[in-house]
Amino acid sequence: SITQEQLEKTARTFRQVCQPKHKISDEVADAVNRGVFADTKDFKCYVSCLLDIMQVARKGKVNYEKSLKQIDTMLPDHMKPAFRAGLEACKSAAQGVKDHCEAAAILLQCFYKNNPKFVFP
């Protein structure tokens, strides 16, 4: 299992890919971990970009099996149960939402609500 430090390093790498692409400031990106979600197309597409890179979702659709694997390999042990519970609660939260950026934002908010140990790059 990986350490908290390794997790944060990986998260920074992911963020560096998606942030410039969608012109998201550090303030807006950091606010996510406090439950503040910007209501802009750019932000929602940034979230979609991150979920894609993390292999949690592909174009706004949850990749359940892949996500479970990611939880096992990418997270420290003390975070795994909370992330599994969040995934379980949210796997179909954005079902039927056509716009993948919109769908990603719905998923993110659901994960935040259903996972007490929520962290996002």
Swiss-Prot record:
GO molecular function: dibutyl phthalate binding; odorant binding
Disulfide bridges in this chain: 45-101, 90-110
Assigned GO CC terms: extracellular region
Organism phylogeny: Eukaryota, Metazoa, Ecdysozoa, Arthropoda, Hexapoda
UniProt keyword terms in alphabetical order: Disulfide bond, Olfaction, Secreted, Sensory transduction, Transport
Protein name: General odorant-binding protein 72
Function: Present in the aqueous fluid surrounding olfactory sensory dendrites and are thought to aid in the capture and transport of hydrophobic odorants into and through this fluid.
Pfam families the record matches: PBP_GOBP
Signal sequence interval, chain numbering: none
Principal location listed in the UniProt entry: secreted
